[in-house]
Amino acid sequence: MSELILDKSRWGWWQSAVFYQIYPKSFLDTTGSGVGDLKGITQRLDYLQQLGISGIWLSPVFRSPQVDNGYDISDYCAIDPLFGSMEDMEELIAEGKKRNISIILDLVLNHCSDQHPWFLEAKKSRENPFHDYFLWKDGDGITPPNEMRACFGGPAWTYVPEIGQWYFHQFAPQQPDLNWTNPAMRQALYRAIRFWVDKGVEGFRLDVIDQIGKDPDLQVTGNGPRLHEYLRELSAAAFREPGIVTVGEAWGADVERAKLYSNPDCSELSMVFQFQHIGLDQQEGKEKWDTKPLYLPDLKRCLAHWQNGLHGCGWNSLFMNNHDLPRVVSRWGNDGIYRVKSAKMLATMLHGMEGTPYIYQGEELGMTNIKLPIGEYRDLEILNMYKERMAKGCREEDVMASIYARGRDNARTPMQWTDSENAGFTTGTP
């Protein structure tokens, strides 16, 4: 075993922690607006303390147009009024500390909102000092610079006729990618992170962080050539306190890459979310909507591979649910008569491995997937997929079956606090 791991002084508090992810919109509404809020989280801290958690991973609460449920940030240093005020956030941090519950913020450093002041300035002219905060290519407005596709569907380029250029976005057109080759842009992000560290935040979940080293000219998005250079600089500049925990979302990570991310010298990140086990029920070479039955020996081999691969030279994050995934009880268990037994079995597997467990709101209750009419879904990914597949002539019942099985809104329904109307989540309309 690595001497670095044997030296307990290099261990972080997070290596013996359990984190609980909260999706604020659907956790608890205290105002009757139908949307969860920060005060609702503060009200339930005693419940969370009784669960035995060490920290809360809080999905984005920054100011945002909410095109992608807060993952399109328009102000990194402001709370969206949808969730409350800065005073509400400060109260949550302070009350959490009283209960030894740390607050971990979900931060998007790969892209921002097209309503962020940086982008509003950037598209005014090519000479604007914020122009190079983003990725641009000249063009005629008819043919995009290349054939890259956005993750939510459609081209990865959108044209701005006022300046005769296309900007790059891996997700929605309202989420322009930030240009990490620009030192001024990087420093602006680091200042925003320090703002929250100074307020008492003790860690960050970094959304699609493996994308920041992208090179659209080479059609490279994940694990780009300068990725680890950027991560080391980010860690040194923004996460310099030893107690700050960082977990990076890295869909393309394998064990060897994860060793670089989570090496014990903490020069990059504390750990990463990798998704190899999550893809085992997806048909090879197809989209996430195209599923196949999970073969249990494959899951066992995958989990063992990561446990053995990072033992002594990195650190595993452990999860089966989050805001982007269907409920695991419905996915890999039996959400009918064996719902409770399935939930307990899956929890035993999760907490029996080496690593830091992350549980998602309602996971402790064995919450399940839902089936709604298409008009009641709100997730941009679901709506785009439905539109594209229906346009291709797919049968609606097949499209809806895929949404029921894999849609992200499965995880975003209200937390079930009681058996009363709206599950005790709100006195209004969810």
What are these regions (language model features)?
Residues 1-430:
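Active-site and adjacent substrate-binding regions of carbohydrate-active enzymes
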